[in-house]
């Protein structure tokens, strides 16, 4: 069968359009792209490597390389579409400067922290790592080692890292970079519902009458979901979109209710909406009386800075997440002070706009989806913002039904599936278990076949605290995988770089390319990427997706999972576990951590025969058993029967993912609702079963100011973020020629009047300066981002312009998530 280029392109367009419309796909269109008889290309499915949307792509390989990708028509998430980054997935692994062998800083053949990077073998790399880890463990104990992972870790990577750190090394100093992006969402879910992750799903988009974006530029950060929102808005009369942000961006192009507000004032707007609902008698009293409790939150909780910082010293209740019961009438009185006039004064938004927004929520006939990402979460009161938007949905009963959903969008491909569900945070274990709960630790120890008391009960150091402890010499052995924290962390010159270069510390970075972080490391380990290994991600709608390895990694690059497992062989329990633990459990004496953690009868349970025929799998072939299946099935034990049920491993390779809980082979679209969620009891209607009484909580939480605001010297707000062309720090996308050319350099976006008043013109070189640092960049007064007077926006993908030299390392005191959206700067001509 021969197909012309014209017919090929036409068929592909027909297929995508048909899938987007939800109609059947012509056979010729559905098969033409992946018909290997035409191209000699082998096609397999995998989730996209980039954001948390969880698009599925078809990956084409030929002669051992990924040569093409296209949107997976069979995927219910993206329906054959890709964003601009997704279209160039095939190129992310083939940058000219790909790392292919371990590199150690050396002088005259020996390790030297100030030496030059020199190639070494994997054995040599693990030898020096083990030497440094053992020295640190012996001298200072497990709290002096740490690991910083990622929401881009596969499920297997994160799970193995958690076992190695929390059970093997008995240290809870394990964190993902998702601390920077999703931690406030997590704590918000836990406080309100007692269980993590959204109750709704993407199907809500096709059922909603209104969409409200709180600090979310979906058109650039979640473009495939935005196509679905756009389709709903343009094809169904009466559907409305409201976009709230501190500056105008591309999502405003579709906004019926555009709102630009003063940074931090979203707290006041949210409380006003609750007040509006109550004063206009729009509370769903039947729902709230049956399914809601009210509590007053502790206030004046500080800003997550170092204890000696004046703002921390001044806080009355630093880091407190406590709350006390209150009645509906008391809650009504609390929000009554948030009148439209007060909210307008604090936010700078005209009263009529605020009322128009509030009416979307108040009207019982309007089904509303609230979307948010970093604008809410990267916020010194991010947890409160999450709680307050839930207040609105709970007051109106607009929750857990099709088209009614408060929906926290995820930034990374497995911030949900790995960081949150696997539990790679310093306080967590899988399936919402926590290290501070003795019963939870016992569950983990039983599943992992470990002695009672193996897992420590003390919460480890969170991401920002890890950087501070490295600087202060309290963490001395540190392993970083799948992130670029020296570019991505806040206040990097003062709080991050000093710890990496502290002569008492040994820093290991597993990376695919040279980055700002790897340049500051002592040892760099070359890492396999994406489909160079078998993997699994979990997206924002609780959809777990797995993929097979499709190509080999270049040179000596190895999967992160292999690195973790192989490193565990270098330690015996006698070297890392306390004597009393081993004396009471002598069967564990003399065993390696590899034996204890990965040859435990669970992980090594499945033979190589279980591998799909013709499938590559470097780790499994190396170890002689199906590593990934064993890890997955052991991990799944945590959630089955506890509201986090995963399907059997093989089922995921037969589908485009499943949304948990998966019970009796059926996924769950809407949690907490009878008839949709198998955990809701018959007759309950709704049941928020993460709480002991099955009721969600509405919190009374006030507006409180930002940690740092503009003043006479530093007279402008700075907000940072991303652009559609680049992923996070740009270490992958800047190596794709088409994406680099589309957006090669960062700029400072500012209002034309602000530029004019400073004698600046578009294209001028300027310094963006804060109390902490400065960068040189160029002025942009046009284009996609249009800040109001008094605010500037700088994207952070550009390693030549490290804007996080400038940002403040203030965090939400409850979630420990950094606020990258608000600090004070000045702009001066360079």
From Swiss-Prot:
UniProt xrefs under Gene3D superfamilies: 2.40.40.20, 3.30.200.210, 3.40.50.740, Dimethylsulfoxide Reductase, domain 2
Name of the protein this chain belongs to: Periplasmic nitrate reductase 2
Organism: Photobacterium profundum (strain SS9)
Gene Ontology CC: one annotated term: nitrate reductase complex
SUPFAM superfamilies the record matches: ADC-like (SSF50692), Formate dehydrogenase/DMSO reductase, domains 1-3 (SSF53706)
PROSITE patterns: 4FE4S_MOW_BIS_MGD (PS51669), MOLYBDOPTERIN_PROK_1 (PS00551), TAT (PS51318)
Cofactor: binding comment: Binds 1 [4Fe-4S] cluster.
Residues annotated to bind Mo-bis(molybdopterin guanine dinucleotide): 85, 152, 177, 181, 245-249, 264-266, 374, 378, 484, 510-511, 533, 560, 720-729, 804, 821
């Amino acid at each position: 069968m021969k197909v012309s280029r014209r017919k090929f392109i036409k068929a592909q367009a027909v297929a995508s359009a048909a899938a987007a419309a939800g109609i059947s796909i012509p056979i010729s269109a559905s098969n033409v792209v992946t018909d290997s008889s035409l191209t000699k290309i082998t096609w397999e499915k995998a989730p996209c490597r980039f954001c948390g949307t969880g698009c599925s792509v078809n990956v084409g390989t030929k002669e051992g390389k990924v040569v093409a990708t296209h949107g997976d028509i069979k995927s219910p998430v993206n329906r054959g579409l890709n964003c601009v980054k997704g279209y160039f997935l095939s190129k992310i692994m083939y940058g000219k400067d790909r790392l292919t062998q371990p590199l150690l800083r050396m002088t005259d053949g020996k390790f030297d922290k100030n030496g030059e990077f020199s190639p070494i073998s994997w054995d040599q790399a693990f030898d020096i790592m083990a030497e440094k880890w053992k020295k640190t463990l012996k001298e200072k104990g497990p709290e002096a080692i740490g690991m910083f992972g990622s929401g881009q870790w596969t499920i297997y990577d994160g799970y193995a890292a958690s076992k190695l750190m929390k059970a093997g090394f008995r240290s809870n100093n394990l964190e993902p970079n998702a601390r920077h992006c999703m931690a406030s969402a997590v704590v918000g879910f836990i406080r309100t519902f007692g269980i993590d992750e959204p109750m709704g799903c993407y199907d809500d988009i096709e059922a909603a009458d209104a969409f409200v974006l709180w600090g979310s530029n979906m058109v650039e950060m979640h473009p495939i979901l935005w196509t679905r929102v756009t389709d709903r808005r343009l094809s169904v009369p009466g559907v409305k979109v409201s976009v709230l942000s501190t500056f105008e961006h591309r999502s405003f192009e579709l906004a019926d209710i555009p709102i630009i507000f003063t940074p931090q004032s979203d707290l006041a707007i949210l409380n006003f909406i609750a007040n509006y609902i109550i004063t206009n008698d729009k509370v769903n009293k039947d729902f709230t009386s049956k399914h809601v409790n009210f509590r007053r939150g502790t206030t004046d909780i500080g800003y997550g800075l170092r204890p000696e910082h004046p703002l921390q010293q001044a806080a009355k209740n630093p880091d407190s997440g406590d709350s006390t019961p209150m009645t509906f009438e008391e809650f009504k009185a609390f929000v009554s002070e948030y009148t439209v006039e007060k909210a307008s004064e604090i936010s700078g938004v005209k009263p009529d706009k605020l009322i128009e927004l509030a009416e979307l929520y108040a009207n019982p006939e309007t089904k509303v989806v609230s979307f948010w990402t970093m604008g809410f979460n990267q916020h010194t009161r991010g947890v409160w913002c999450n709680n307050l938007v839930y207040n609105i949905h709970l007051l109106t009963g607009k929750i857990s039904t099709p088209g009614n959903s408060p929906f926290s969008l995820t930034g990374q491909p497995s911030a949900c599936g790995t960081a949150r569900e696997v539990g790679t945070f310093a306080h967590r274990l899988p399936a919402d278990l926590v290290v501070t709960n003795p019963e939870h630790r016992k569950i983990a120890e039983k599943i992992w076949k470990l002695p009672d008391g193996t897992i420590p009960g003390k919460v480890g150091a969170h991401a920002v605290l890890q950087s501070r402890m490295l600087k202060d010499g309290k963490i001395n052995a540190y392993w970083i995988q799948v992130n670029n924290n020296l570019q991505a962390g806040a206040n990097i010159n003062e709080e991050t770089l000093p710890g990496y270069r502290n002569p008492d510390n040994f820093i290991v970075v597993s990376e695919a390319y040279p980055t700002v972080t790897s340049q500051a490391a002592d040892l760099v380990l070359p890492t396999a990427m994406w489909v160079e290994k078998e993997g699994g991600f979990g997206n924002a709608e609780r959809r777990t997706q797995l993929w097979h390895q499709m190509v080999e990694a270049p040179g000596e690059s190895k999967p992160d999972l292999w690195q973790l497992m192989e490193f565990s062989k270098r330690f015996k329990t006698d070297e890392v576990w306390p004597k009393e633990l081993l004396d009471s459990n002598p069967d564990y004496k003399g065993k390696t951590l590899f034996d204890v953690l990965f040859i435990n009868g669970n992980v090594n349970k499945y033979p190589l025969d279980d591998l799909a025929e013709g499938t590559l799998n470097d780790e499994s072939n190396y170890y002689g058993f199906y590593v990934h299946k064993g890890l997955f099935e052991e991990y799944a034990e945590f959630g089955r029967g506890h509201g986090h049920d995963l399907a059997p491993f093989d089922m995921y390779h037969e589908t485009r993912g499943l949304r948990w809980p998966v019970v009796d082979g059926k996924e769950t679209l809407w949690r907490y609702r009878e008839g949709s969620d198998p955990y809701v009891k018959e007759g309950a209607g709704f049941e928020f079963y993460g709480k002991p009484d099955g009721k969600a909580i509405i919190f009374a939480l006030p507006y409180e100011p930002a940690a740092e605001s503009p003043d006479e010297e530093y007279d402008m707000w700075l907000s940072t973020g991303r652009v559609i062309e680049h992923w996070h720090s740009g270490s992958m996308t800047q190596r794709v020629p088409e994406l680099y050319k589309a957006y090669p350099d960062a700029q400072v976006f500012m209002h034309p009047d602000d530029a004019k008043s400073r004698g600046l013109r578009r294209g001028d070189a300027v310094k963006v300066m804060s109390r902490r640092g400065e960068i040189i960049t160029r002025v942009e007064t046009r284009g996609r981002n249009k800040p109001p007077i008094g605010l500037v926006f700088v994207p952070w993908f550009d390693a030549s312009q490290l804007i996080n030299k400038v940002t403040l390392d203030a965090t939400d005191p409850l979630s420990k998530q950094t606020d990258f959206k608000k600090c004070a700067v000045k702009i001066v001509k360079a």
